[in-house]
Swiss-Prot record:
A Gene Ontology biological process term: regulation of protein localization
Biased composition (Polar residues): 534-558
Subcellular location: Cytoplasm, Cytoskeleton, Cilium basal body; Cytoplasm, Cytoskeleton, Microtubule organizing center, Centrosome, Centriole
Species for this entry: Danio rerio
Protein name per UniProt: Cilium assembly protein DZIP1L
């Protein structure tokens, strides 16, 4: 049957020269058959195709393969409608039949080929078995031959021994072919027939003896030299052992000193932590007592105010005011709850960041200690590692102190309640409101306004787009200089090496561009001239008046030109002249802006808060919450003390806040790690509580009165060294200068905008 393999069929083409599986032979013999098989529709209807596919029943397929392949479908009609079969379906079925027939032919062909290959495999297997038998026979004969060869060799060896024993009875002359029975005859023959050989032999023997004597002398000298070398080697080994012992003792003493120093530092650190914890607890108790007293007074005032509103004539007017006050209190409580959750989240983030930095510093410390144990022979490397360990431990202690100060600030700000003022609606309040707002706007207008238009004219979108580009270029330059990304500080040795590298690059660029200094001077003069002309034309104060005031900052271009002109001696004189100024407390007048190197310390100007609306929730991280823009009756300004000093304050996601993030390292530098941040916050809060407040007519004072006056702010001026004016760091200085200037000007614009 077609498609089935019968093993009994002869396979005659297996030994032919032409391969039996060639396509030419296959297609010459293959022809499509006619379709004459009948269709058993009943049997086909009882067939379960899904079961056949699921069980892979090949026998059922083998039964139906001939019927499906060679059936005629042209005359078949539908049993229901007796209509002819669709021609397209007939074509499809015929193509499937032809494909199946071709596949059956391929199956038969492959089956025949498989049978031939099996026969050839059997023949090859029989040949291999015959070869194995022959090989076994050959191996057996080889073993017998080897044994015979071994016996023959033994026989030949015994015969050679016998022949050599018989030949030793004769003494053959070395110079001719004669042999003698006795050795005396041989010597007489040599002396008689070969006299020249005997003289040469004597001379040779004499020379050999002389050479042997010289060799003996040389051996004696070599022995003495080896003994001396051994003695010297022993002395050298002893000296090396002594040096190693001394080095080991020195390293042991240094390690003990390092351990003692680490123990002392750890003890000091624990003592400082305990002192700071005690200080924080004491200050938190004081703040809690103050807040409780303020809340008690607030409740008393609220009770008094509520008692005044119980009159029958004002009953109708007090209902909307009461609802408004309740709404404000509810909004304030919700806002305080949000604040607490945000502070708690930031506190956890700061703790995680601190733990990660602590782990990094510990891993760096362990790596340095391992390097210290490996490099035992170099005392200089040990000193360098000790310096690095000291710097890392100091950084770790500073980080811990900063984290502690942040925790205390978070606790204080979360524990401090925000007072709510009970305000009565009177005609006098509404009439006094514009007067107070005008007074505030006049007080805020005392701030320098010559920086504010610059920020108003600026494009925030352009600033947002240029900021990541500048930051990326700065990070690339720092990485090219050898500083890894995320580095928060460098050691003195790294600073010295980078300074020498920058000095060399600066000198090289200066040699490449000889006209750099003249171009710089000309640009400086041109910029100064244009600034003076613009200031004169606009009526703004000139740099001379700013210099006389001593508080307003010049433009970044003027600062850069001044830095380019100053040399190292001038910077030293400026530092010496400014050091006594930094120690004296100087008042900060309203009409002068703080310099860019100072940490701005903004005090509360007015205790008036607007109604809490959604428009004013974006200013939680700034120093001021702006006053109301509407025509409401009264307003109280809430001041968050220490918000400028707190680096983990909630971001406002504005351009001004993005510029404030760049000034955080300066704030960290100005903060004293011994808890001075907490003390500064406490003093500022006490000053705010003790500052006299102007209340509108009909308003109620919610804070206790105090007779203390605010202390003058201590201004810390930082001197810039003249060595930072190189061309490589110019982009860094411009970037930091612009951001610092933008930060200060944005703060000025914000304070002036609150009064508008």
């Amino acid at each position: 049957m077609l498609g089935q393999f019968s093993p009994g069929e002869p396979y005659t083409t297996s030994l032919s020269s032409t391969p039996p599986w060639s396509p030419a032979n296959q297609f010459q013999l293959f022809r499509f058959r006619s379709r004459t098989e009948p269709i058993d529709w009943r049997r086909l209807s009882t067939l379960d195709v899904d079961r056949v596919a699921r069980d892979m029943d090949v026998s059922v397929l083998q039964d139906f393969i001939m019927t499906v392949t060679f059936c005629a479908l042209e005359g078949e009609r539908c049993p229901n409608c007796r209509g002819p079969v669709d021609p397209s379906l007939v074509k499809l079925l015929r193509m499937s039949q032809l494909s199946t027939e071709y596949l059956l032919q391929c199956q038969d062909f492959l089956s025949s080929q498989l049978a031939g290959l099996e026969e050839r495999l059997q023949a090859a297997t029989s040949l291999v078995q015959q070869g194995e038998g022959q090989r076994a026979e050959l191996e057996k004969s080889l073993q017998e031959t080897k044994q015979e060869n071994r016996r023959r060799k033994q026989l030949i060896a015994t015969q050679q021994l016998l022949l050599q024993a018989s030949a030793n009875n004769y003494h053959k002359c070395q110079f001719c072919e004669k042999s003698f029975v006795n050795y005396s005859y041989l010597q007489a023959h040599v002396q008689r027939r070969h006299p020249e050989v005997t003289d040469a032999e004597k001379q040779k023997k004499r020379k050999v003896e002389e050479m042997e004597d010289g060799i003996e002398e040389l051996k004696e000298k070599l022995r003495l030299t080896q003994m001396q070398l051994q003695e010297e080697q022993q002395a050298d080994n002893l000296r090396r052992q002594q040096e190693q012992e001394q080095q080991r003792r020195r390293e042991q003493s240094e390690k003990e000193a390092l351990e003692r120093w680490k123990e002392d530092e750890r003890r000091k650190f624990n003592q400082e932590i305990a002192d700071l914890r005690q200080l924080f607890l004491q200050e938190s108790k004081e703040m809690a007592s103050k807040s409780s007293s303020i809340e008690a007074k607030l409740l008393v005032l609220q009770n008094k105010e509520m008692a005044g509103f119980n009159n029958a004539s004002l009953q109708q007017d007090s209902d909307p005011e009461k609802e408004m006050r309740e709404n404000r209190e509810r909004e304030l409580r919700e806002r305080i709850a949000r604040k607490k959750s945000e502070w708690r989240r930031k506190f956890q983030e700061a703790q995680k960041r601190h733990q990660q930095e602590n782990k990094e510093l510990k891993s760096e410390n362990s790596r340095l200690l391992k390097a210290l144990s490996v490099e035992k022979n170099s005392t200089s490397s040990v000193q360098k590692l000790q310096q690095q360990v000291v710097s890392l431990s100091s950084q770790l202690s500073q980080k811990d102190r900063l984290i502690k100060s942040q925790e205390e600030k978070i606790k204080k700000l979360s524990a401090t309640p925000v007072p709510v003022s009970v305000v009565s609606l009177n005609d006098q309040d509404s009439s006094e409101e514009p007067v107070e707002q005008d007074r505030d706007s006049q007080e805020d207008s005392d701030e320098p306004q010559w920086k504010a238009p610059k920020i108003r004219k600026g494009k925030p979108a352009l600033m947002r787009e240029s900021k990541p580009i500048l930051e990326e270029s700065l990070e690339q330059k720092l990485e090219n200089m050898g500083l890894r990304k995320g580095t928060k500080g460098i050691s003195k040795q790294t600073f010295k090496s980078l300074s020498s590298l920058l000095a060399g690059q600066r000198l090289q660029k200066f040699r490449q561009q000889t006209n750099l200094q003249s171009l710089r001077d000309s640009l400086t003069l041109e910029v100064t001239r244009r600034v003076k002309s613009l200031q004169k034309s606009s009526g703004k104060p000139t740099p001379n008046t700013l210099k006389q005031r001593g508080k307003k900052t010049s433009t970044p271009l003027n600062e850069k030109s001044l830095r380019f002109r100053q040399d190292s001696k001038a910077s030293d004189r400026r530092e010496k002249s400014q050091q006594p100024k930094t120690l004296l407390p100087t008042p900060t007048p309203r009409s002068k802006a703080p310099p860019p190197n100072q940490t701005p310390k903004i005090l509360a100007k007015k205790n008036s808060t607007p109604p809490f609306s959604s428009d004013e929730e974006s200013v939680e991280d700034t120093a001021y919450i702006t006053s109301s823009r509407g025509n409401l009756s009264s307003s109280v300004r809430v001041v968050q003390s220490g918000s400028l000093l707190n680096p983990t304050t909630e971001p406002d996601w504005t351009d001004s806040e993005l510029s404030e993030d760049l000034d955080l390292p300066k704030i960290y530098k100005t903060c004293n790690p011994q808890g001075s941040v907490v003390q500064t916050l406490t003093r500022s809060l006490e000053r705010q509580l003790s500052t006299p407040i102007k209340t509108p007519v009909g308003g109620t004072r919610v804070l206790p009165p105090s007779s203390t006056t605010p202390r003058p702010a201590i201004v810390k001026q930082q001197a810039l060294s003249g060595e930072e004016s190189d061309s490589e760091l110019s982009s860094i200085e411009e970037l930091t200068g612009r951001r610092a200037g933008g930060h200060k000007s944005l703060e000025v614009d914000r304070t002036s905008g609150t009064s508008a």
